[in-house]
Amino acid sequence: MREIVFNNRNSLSASLICSGWDPYKGYQIYAVNQVGFKTEGDYAVSGSGSVFITGYMDANFKPTMTKVAAKEFLKNCISLACFRDGSSGGCMRLVDITKEKVEREFIPYASFPIK
């Protein structure tokens, strides 16, 4: 992914986030910026609204959050980004990836906790 972004840096204008699970390292998440620089961490944030929520994420992210707490955290993050950034989307699409399954959830703007 890094090489694809780097080799197409003149025609791509997006950062990428790639996440998944495998039996060797477990959960992993990577961010690849617009020139192909890759970072790995506990979470990744990208897009025009990310500048508005990075501080909130740094202050409130807890690696030991329950699934319910993590979903509320994400809902607040995305709501804050949309509230401050007119270019951030009008809905949320959450995906929970585990060893056993992939669960998808769609949340319309009307259900955002912060508007």
Feature map (PLM): residue ranges:
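Long, low-complexity N-terminal extensions
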Residues: 1-115
